[in-house]
Every structure is written in C-alpha cells, then in structure tokens.
Amino acid sequence: MEMEHINENTIRVLIGNEDLADRGITFLDLLGNHKDVENFFYSILEEVDVEDEFQGSEAVTFQVLPKNDGLELFISKNVAMDDLSSLEGLSEVNADVSELIRKQIEADKAAADELDEMEATDETNRNVIFELDNFEAMIQLSKEVFMQSVLTNLYTYNDRYYLQVLFLTDELEKTNVDNEIAQILEFAHKTTVTQDTLVEYGTCIMERSALELTRYYFND
C-alpha cells in the first residue's frame, strides 16, 4: 500500500488487490453500506499514519477509483463545492477525478430530495424488481440496456442480486416501459421478492443509478 499527498487537503492511497484480500474486502463491498465502509476508510488513514491530519475536520470525503491491480483511494478533508478547483492537480492521475468528486458530492446532497420524490410519486410510477443470477449478469445488463427516466437500485439478499427499477411513467409511454422490461428480462428474471423485503432484510450496494455506476466502474 502506497500513500502520497496531492495537496494539503487530499491524499491518494494506492491499495493493491493483495491489500484488499488481506482485509477480506472487495471493490464491490466499497459500494455498500456507508457506515461500514467509512470504518474501513478510517482504518486506512490510521495505517498510513495521517489520521491526525483529518481529526476534527467538518467534512471528510472518500472517493474510490478501480484499477486492474486494486484501487486508488482519494481522501479529502474540508472540501467545499466552491473549492473543488484545487483538485484539478489530480488530472495527471485521472483526468476525470475532480469531475467525479463534484458529481458524487452533488448526488449526495440531492439524495434526500430524490428519495422523497420517489415516495411522493410511487402511486403513478411503475416499480419492478428483477432477480439476477450473479453480478456478471448485472455487468452485461449495464452494457446492453440503456434507459432514461428511471431510477435503479441494486440489492443483495440471501446471496442473490436484485435490481429495482422505478420507471417514471409520467415521462414514459407504457409501450416503452414494456419494451425496456423485456430487454432487462434477457439478463434477469421476474421475482416475488418485494421492495419492502429488500429494504428491511437486504443490503443496497448501489443506489439511484445502479446501471450507470456498474457501467462506469466495470466497463472493460
């Protein structure tokens, strides 16, 4: 595991696959429960002996980028939307990092409003749950099916993967929804598992944009 300071507010940690294996964690795990993953991130801070630099910070953000031999972890403190220009120096590592951070911070701020919108429009929207044989099926689905006016959540439950698709039917014709469901069923199956069951007993590992996230992180 290697660490370097990008600037006074951001460090980059290179974590190899062997490092992840030693901790019993995979990249997919890092897309799961925020509280559990945060503990992992802070343990990394302790290991690279810079945790004191981040103590007392009002905001600490963790951004993960996959690599063939592991992942890059960017840890930033006190990053405000207006200060993201200071991250432009990351372009030599990955030209899209600063924009990715910006989008993820914006997504976090919009999450509560978006979930409220889902609940408020539930009666008019069409909510469908699909079961996937494995995560590889999810990857293939993300590569072949492109949809607009949908929200997608990916859950694990009883060692299976479930994709929840909320079709915003006020923006989609019923025929379009039926066609998109037919496309999804080429990679998934119908299921009797309900949203309530997944929320109560399952684990949401990708929220709101599961197809887009899978396509971004697992695009060969």
From Swiss-Prot:
Enumerate the InterPro entries for this protein: MecA_C_sf (IPR038471), Neg-reg_MecA (IPR008681)
| Superkingdom of this protein's organism | Bacteria
Q: Can you quote the domain comment?
A: The N-terminal domain probably binds unfolded/aggregated proteins; the C-terminal domain interacts with ClpC.
**Any idea what job this protein has?**
Enables the recognition and targeting of unfolded and aggregated proteins to the ClpC protease or to other proteins involved in proteolysis.
Q: Which HAMAP family match?
A: MecA
Describe its partners and assembly state: Homodimer.
Question: Per its record, how is this protein called by name?
Answer: Adapter protein MecA
Gene designation: mecA
